Amino acid sequence: MSDRIDRDVINALIAGHFADPFSVLGMHKTTAGLEVRALLPDATDVWVIEPKTGRKLAKLECLDSRGFFSGVIPRRKNFFRYQLAVVWHGQQNLIDDPYRFGPLIQEMDAWLLSEGTHLRPYETLGAHADTMDGVTGTRFSVWAPNARRVSVVGQFNYWDGRRHPMRLRKESGIWELFIPGAHNGQLYKYEMIDANGNLRLKSDPYAFEAQMRPETASLICSLPEKVVQTEERKKANQFDAPISIYEVHLGSWRRHTDNNFWLSYRELADQLVPYAKWMGFTHLELLPINEHPFDGSWGYQPTGLYAPTRRFGTRDDFRYFIDAAHAAGLNVILDWVPGHFPTDDFALAEFDGTNLYEHSDPREGYHQDWNTLIYNYGRREVSNFLVGNALYWIERFGIDALRVDAVASMIYRDYSRKEGEWIPNEFGGRENLEAIEFLRNTNRILGEQVSGAVTMAEESTDFPGVSRPQDMGGLGFWYKWNLGWMHDTLDYMKLDPIYRQYHHDKLTFGMLYNYTENFVLPLSHDEVVHGKKSILDRMPGDAWQKFANLRAYYGWMWAFPGKKLLFMGNEFAQGREWNHDASLDWHLLEGGDNWHHGVQRLVRDLNHTYRHHKAMHELDFDPYGFEWLVVDDKERSVLIFVRRDKEGNEIIVASNFTPVPRHDYRFGINQPGKWREILNTDSMHYHGSNAGNGGAVHSDEIASHGRQHSLSLTLPPLATIWLVREAE
């Protein structure tokens, strides 16, 4: 043994308190010659082997009964490839020494990761099956700059943190190690002695797969192949495209009837995908599928941002689901949560014993409402972790859009906080400048790297320019949820019709700000939980009126400017609130034809009619695409407007939000001729009263509402009708 290795070093190494194992272990030049040292707990004999011949070159001496071996190779001066023959419990095993391999992360990668500008950090960090110097294994790397020691533990080393301590790259704070023989499918974690001397066991922030709760280990898994983005998928996201989104929680859309267990990704591909296609939706939006420990969070408190949840199957099963959606002509939107993460000890919280991913001050780093931690967007490595994750889902899974959750909680430092509970920014303001820059940067990078994919913001305030370009001072999102429209219209619809005349502006106010953003009109999962009731149950009146109100509302929503979003169950008027632990009430559609079938047929017809007529979607964000015909008839709660396409073709939309049919209702129009009724929410086909206009009506050369020509219609009770002018 070389006199350079003293007993204190051996003790520290065996105790797991030595931060630089490569300085001791592996092959080293010493005054005595080439010396090989190995830490192999429980081994009894160790030989150095010549791989080509299998010849034993030297037997290593056991210098410590806890497993430290060392020996000099005679007549060798230059480093060479070797193996170790190790006897454990009477059985000899031939292994490759992890400590004979050089640094793994290239200097450029290390620099980019430290700068926070590595577009795809997941290609370097995490666990990657690889072949090095002809040896198959897995290279591991994890960012933990303040840890005193980090080891890889897993099924390949008996979860023993003494066996595979990692190399620290001080310039980046990244620990790395290549472990020969570790392979896909094996479980692993990082064992570390943190900055405070505490022993911690952490899952991999960059793991591509993870165990299903309540277990928390990561799985070695190869990086998915890139998914080519097609022109059809790009076009389906554009501003002039028809976008009708079916929002789904995969764990409760439908369950196995015999045991109430979830459907798998592949079963959902076979059932959910064809259903959404048949219903006429253009997009599927998935509540977060990132791995998460608590079912009741619905996925909005993720611990594995890079890992699809194992609740429904493997990573490849999820890819199969997305491929099936694309084959059916459906784009896929993923709810993405870069705003906060849970406090679970096995995940990101105090990752290396310090507030690495989160702010240290709870006034900046703690969400009081959700008992979660807030990312420190000003830290370059943290921002890089998140930006890379956005790119990962789009490039590696073919996700077509990201819907960013709780944007308001990110961009305001005083979000849901009282005075004294938040820290102003450097200019004394309430805006979180680092979060704003992070969102702008994310949207910019996605626009540059994956043209055609888009982002949508759930932003609940009037922050200006959410869906405006960064060079105009905006955040750079493509779309923003119109939560104001949603609240106003639902508040209106829950009123008894006799009182609606006093709240007429709740339906018209949205047009005053409609062109300030690129809006999506959402009836999301948030509107059918926490005692808010189902959408159907918010409607006033008896059963007939409830369904009629709902149908009229849907007819209004699908005609109003903006893309559409409907949470699962609302398409057939589920009567109870959503329960994430149970299937939707599909039994409502069993037996004979009923009101629920009627609503389902209406939503299907709305989708198909909306998609067929460009006037209903082509100019959602252009004032030319909309015009009021009747806006002030609050006494009768009647509203009529025109939707228009680029060629000037018009569709008339008329809504009567009282149970009183309005006969001979005359209003002025722009284009005289024969107007055909293409949708009537009061049709008997939808279980309405079947009032209407006999399928079509001719205009009269009678002036009305400042226009030379007019129509005289029957407006059915609690109904919305659409009319299109037939060609001459």
From Swiss-Prot:
Catalytic activity: Transfers a segment of a (1->4)-alpha-D-glucan chain to a primary hydroxy group in a similar glucan chain
GO molecular function, one term: 1,4-alpha-glucan branching enzyme activity
Keyword terms: Carbohydrate metabolism, Glycogen biosynthesis, Glycogen metabolism, Glycosyltransferase, Transferase
Pfam families in alphabetical order: Alpha-amylase, Alpha-amylase_C, CBM_48, GlgB_N
Disulphide-bonded residues: none
E.C. code: 2.4.1.18
Active site feature: 405, 458
GO annotation, cellular component aspect: cytosol
Enzyme class: transferase
Record SUPFAM superfamilies: (Trans)glycosidases, E set domains, Glycosyl hydrolase domain
Superkingdom of the organism of origin: Bacteria
Role of this protein: Catalyzes the formation of the alpha-1,6-glucosidic linkages in glycogen by scission of a 1,4-alpha-linked oligosaccharide from growing alpha-1,4-glucan chains and the subsequent attachment of the oligosaccharide to the alpha-1,6 position.
Assembly notes: Monomer.
Similarity comment: family membership: Belongs to the glycosyl hydrolase 13 family. GlgB subfamily.
Protein name: 1,4-alpha-glucan branching enzyme GlgB
Gene that produces this protein: glgB
